[in-house]
């Protein structure tokens, strides 16, 4: 079985080819989330933050499902449709890496589950993309 930390490292390696900043985060509160966002250099955007959500065992405990959230962060852009649309392109960029039908990365099947807006700071726009990471445990 591939450990959760190794899954996060493998995802980070894939994202580093596309995003200027990639961080693996242990945030659990809104305050920690804000601190993590503010620690990113605005010149190193767009950024991707990998955050642990939970894991479950399914199919009579033969499959482990880890759930991570991939937070895609960019600067907030107003008064320009073209600049704002740059944020709209980021989920497509992620789906090029993790297609909706899934992808195997070193023995773990990874696919996006959902996408919601999640920004809490005026200067940033953020999208939270749920990633499901499945692997057999027998």
Task: State where each predicted segment sits.
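A short catalytic or substrate-binding loop motif that flags glycine-/basic-rich loops and adjacent residues
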Residues: 42
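Charged, amphipathic alpha-helical segments and their flanking helix caps
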Residues: 1-30, 35-39, 49-138
């Amino acid at each position: 079985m591939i450990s959760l930390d190794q899954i996060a490292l493998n995802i980070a390696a894939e994202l580093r080819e596309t995003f200027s900043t990639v961080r693996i985060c242990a945030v659990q509160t809104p305050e920690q989330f804000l601190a993590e966002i503010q620690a990113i250099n605005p010149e190193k955007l767009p950024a991707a933050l990998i955050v642990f959500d939970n894991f479950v065992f399914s199919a009579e405990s033969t499959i482990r499902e880890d759930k991570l959230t991939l937070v895609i962060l960019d600067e907030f852009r107003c008064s320009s449709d073209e600049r704002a649309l740059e944020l709209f392109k980021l989920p497509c960029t992620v789906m090029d890496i993790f297609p909706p039908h899934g992808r195997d990365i070193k023995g773990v099947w990874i696919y996006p589950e959902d996408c919601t807006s999640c920004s809490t700071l005026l200067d940033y726009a953020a999208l939270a993309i749920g990633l499901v990471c499945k692997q057999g445990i027998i």
